[in-house]
Amino acid sequence: MEESAPFSIVSTVKALSGALRGDAGHEADISREREKLWFKESSAKNLRNRDFLAPNTVLTTLYAGGEVPSDILSAVHTLRGSGVLPIGATEVTTEGLRVCVDRCAAFRGVLCGIMPYLKPAAQRQGCVLINCPALHTKQSVPSPDTLALGQLRTILIADHLGAQLRRQGYTVSFCPALPQESDIVNFLKTLGIDWPTVPVSWTNEDREEKMKKALENSAYRDRETEKGKRRSRGEEIEGEKRGLKEDVRINLKQVVQDENLNGYDPSLGTCTVQREALCHLAQLDSATADFPASTTTALHVTSCQDEFRQQQTAMLWRAAGATALQRLVICGPVKTPGVQMNAAQYFQLRKAQMKEASEMKYGDQVEGQTWDDIIRVMTSATVRFELLSTVHTSPVTLDVQRDSGVSTKGPRGGVFVMYNCARLHTLFSSYEKGVEQGLYPEIPGGTELDFSALKEEGEWLLLFNYLIPFSEILDQSAQTLEHEGGGARVQLRTEQVCRFLVSLSKDFSSYYNRVHVLGEPLPHLFNQMFCRLLLLRALRELYHSALDSLNLPPIPQL
């Protein structure tokens, strides 16, 4: 039923905008511009006296002298609708029209039905191929020692995108498939990446032959250029090595023009087909073999240095007959000032620093398989947050000095996030022990609790800034794919989940350091304790859901 739709910031802002303009009954017609009538507050300071604000500049634009008519004020105050937060109070102040949510009702609505807030707001259909050029065979299979940090960044972004899009309902495949038990596959496993593999003896020769014939017979083959270029004997031998008895040249510029594609490099001209390109095209063809062309999108996740080459490959695939929508996710470089470092060295450095930090805190306890697993996950978390927390088109600069170390206390990065997630595990372990000992009763159903007991400003901040908007954040990659223009590049905000988790961890840590959740086992204190436990249980599930999109399992201690 529409009334049971989870609360949504977007739905609330749209409804408020409609009410302020006097067209609340026509929410579907409200443009994105109208959403700017209202601002959702997020700082603790502003949330003390309002949750949404329509500034005076907006009011004076809409109404003479900024005087809001009484019927409009009434419409805002009595606002209802699918996904709309319950309105508690409205007031015209010197800053504008402020709106306060009925917080008790909001806590009850969210905490008594948390599951919709932990998954994307909508489920979609379609197929997405995520292609990672850094992993394609050139002379030999890539290895951790030959993998540059910029290439590692593209792999982590590809992995994160795949996890997000699968949760949004898409069927996702990855390209290329890698040889089983190869060094690169084992390295990716240490980072929590389950990349598709094939037997070592597997070949893709049939599909390479298919791609070769498709290009030889392509309408975009530039035979005039081929005729004008005689090959030496050495070039003929090299061509035979490439599987091509004669040069095959494709007019990529014509492909771009005929397909009316935007955003491609204007210097794309005529390209000679290399064996490496045939292998790449064969992998793309194999990965999309079971996908219907009409609903398939290919995302090429590549570094800025390799963008031109990948544009060439994309247009060769198109010239060979592929009809999938192709977009490029371009990633900025990774810089390590004063140091040359490959992916394997970087991972080993962070692992050594993580082990050292753990030994300083826990001493001789840090040994055995359990601790090996914890250190591996924490290292993976550190690497992922360092390489994913920046907008993917921007450069990342890493501090890779051996003595810089890592800390669980500093409010940044994967270690801090995992530490605060582990604190929630410890809290609920302590509560469950208290239940076993008879100190506390089981948490009753949310409908039996009085959520007006949640008066701490940090409690509302955690609900309003994190629990309610989370599903909308998970939904944004698919929204961008669906609605952004059809240029070659697409920007998918792959940094959002990491930044969201770091911000959440700062606010949760501040709250948890101030508030004693498990109080004295006195009946008159139980209602507030149970309300807080429900809030923090929802936060724990949020952590797990967000970390799952990064392929990071939560850990019980740190």
Curated annotation (Swiss-Prot):
Residues 213-240 are annotated as: Disordered. Pfam families: DALR_1 (PF05746). GO terms for molecular function: arginine-tRNA ligase activity; ATP binding; tRNA binding. InterPro entries: DALR_anticod-bd, DALRD3, tRNAsynth_Ia_anticodon-bd. Transmembrane segments: none annotated. One of its GO terms (biological process) is tRNA C3-cytosine methylation. PANTHER family: DALR ANTICODON-BINDING DOMAIN-CONTAINING PROTEIN 3, DALRD3 PROTEIN. This is DALR anticodon-binding domain-containing protein 3. It comes from Danio rerio (Zebrafish).
